[in-house]
């Protein structure tokens, strides 16, 4: 196993521990807690894949970070902060919406590009809106936290979420996953519209009508993939 992979995991575990302490002391906001829950799942998945104990990895990560801080100067820290762009956090969904439990009568799911697409294909003839929470860097979607589909009456009918045990995903992965989701839901005569944030930061366009910015041919093509249930 590559030593850099182990070191990276150990440091990530310790930094997550520090962030958890902040959360326990009520020193952070809702997006911070949201990322904390997401990263906890990712670390558990990575730990299982690497065969490493999280507690031991956290202690080793602490030693690594402390050694680095001993040799770090304030001037170096200022330069590092100034040269690193900070991602923004976009929230279409409330805490209640992103943490809500939901059930499917006719479940379908597909894995694509490190993302899990789930939908209830029992849903028919509904008006559905797609909402997402994600980070943005350089005015483009950087990392998806969660995308969920809701009917007009608030029922949740579909979801796209990162798979913790798999490596990260790209903007194109998110686009493809949304295409699969839209195609699968439209197959049952549902009317889909994406939030303005999804359209702006995933596709870089604005649609005044809130319609999904995918050509019909692309949606039909990707909808075929939903037939292969995982």
From Swiss-Prot:
A motif (Nuclear export signal) lies at residues 137-146. One of its GO terms (cellular component) is host cell nucleus. A motif (Nuclear localization signal) lies at residues 34-38. The keyword Ubl conjugation applies. The keyword Transmembrane does not apply. Keywords: Eukaryotic host gene expression shutoff by virus, Host cytoplasm, Host gene expression shutoff by virus, Host mRNA suppression by virus, Host nucleus, Host-virus interaction, Inhibition of host innate immune response by virus, Inhibition of host interferon signaling pathway by virus, Inhibition of host PKR by virus, Inhibition of host pre-mRNA processing by virus, Inhibition of host RIG-I by virus, Inhibition of host RLR pathway by virus, Interferon antiviral system evasion, RNA-binding, Ubl conjugation, Viral immunoevasion. Its main location: host cell. Residues 223-230 are annotated as: PABPN1-binding. Gene3D superfamilies: Influenza virus non-structural protein, effector domain, S15/NS1, RNA-binding. GO terms for molecular function: protein serine/threonine kinase inhibitor activity; RNA binding. It is found in: Host nucleus; Host cytoplasm. Residues 180-215 are annotated as: CPSF4-binding. GO terms for biological process: symbiont-mediated suppression of host cytoplasmic pattern recognition receptor signaling pathway via inhibition of RIG-I activity; symbiont-mediated suppression of host gene expression; symbiont-mediated suppression of host mRNA processing; symbiont-mediated suppression of host PKR/eIFalpha signaling; symbiont-mediated suppression of host type I interferon-mediated signaling pathway. Residues 1-73 are annotated as: RNA-binding and homodimerization. Pfam families: Flu_NS1 (PF00600). Upon interferon induction, ISGylated via host HERC5; this results in the impairment of NS1 interaction with RNA targets due to its inability to form homodimers and to interact with host EIF2AK2/PKR. Belongs to the influenza A viruses NS1 family. Inhibits post-transcriptional processing of cellular pre-mRNA, by binding and inhibiting two cellular proteins that are required for the 3'-end processing of cellular pre-mRNAs: the 30 kDa cleavage and polyadenylation specificity factor/CPSF4 and the poly(A)-binding protein 2/PABPN1. In turn, unprocessed 3' end pre-mRNAs accumulate in the host nucleus and are no longer exported to the cytoplasm. Cellular protein synthesis is thereby shut off very early after virus infection. Homodimer. Interacts with host TRIM25 (via coiled coil); this interaction specifically inhibits TRIM25 multimerization and TRIM25-mediated RIGI CARD ubiquitination. Interacts with human EIF2AK2/PKR, CPSF4, IVNS1ABP and PABPN1. The dsRNA-binding region is required for suppression of RNA silencing. This is Non-structural protein 1. It comes from Influenza A virus (strain A/Turkey/Canada/1963 H6N8).
């Amino acid at each position: 196993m590559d030593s850099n992979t182990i070191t990276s995991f150990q440091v990530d575990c310790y930094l997550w521990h520090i962030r958890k302490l902040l959360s326990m002391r009520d020193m952070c906001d809702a997006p911070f807690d949201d990322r904390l829950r997401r990263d906890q799942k990712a670390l558990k998945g990575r730990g299982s894949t690497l065969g490493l104990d999280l507690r031991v990895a956290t202690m080793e990560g602490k030693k690594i970070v402390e050694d680095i801080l001993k040799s770090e100067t304030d001037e170096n820290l200022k330069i590092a902060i100034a040269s690193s762009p900070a991602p923004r956090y976009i929230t279409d969904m409330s805490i209640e919406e992103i943490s809500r439990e939901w059930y499917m009568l006719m479940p379908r799911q597909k894995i694509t590009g490190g993302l899990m697409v789930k939908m209830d294909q029992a849903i028919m003839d509904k008006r559905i809106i797609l909402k997402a929470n994600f980070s943005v860097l350089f005015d483009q979607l950087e990392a998806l936290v969660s995308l969920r589909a809701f009917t007009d009456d608030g029922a949740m009918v579909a979801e796209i979420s990162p798979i913790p045990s798999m490596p990260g995903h790209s903007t194109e992965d998110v686009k493809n996953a949304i295409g699969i989701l839209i195609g699968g839901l439209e197959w049952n005569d549902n009317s889909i519209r994406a939030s303005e944030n999804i359209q702006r930061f995933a596709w870089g366009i604005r649609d005044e009508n809130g319609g999904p910015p995918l050509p019909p041919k692309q949606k039909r093509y990707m909808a075929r993939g939903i037939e292969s249930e995982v």
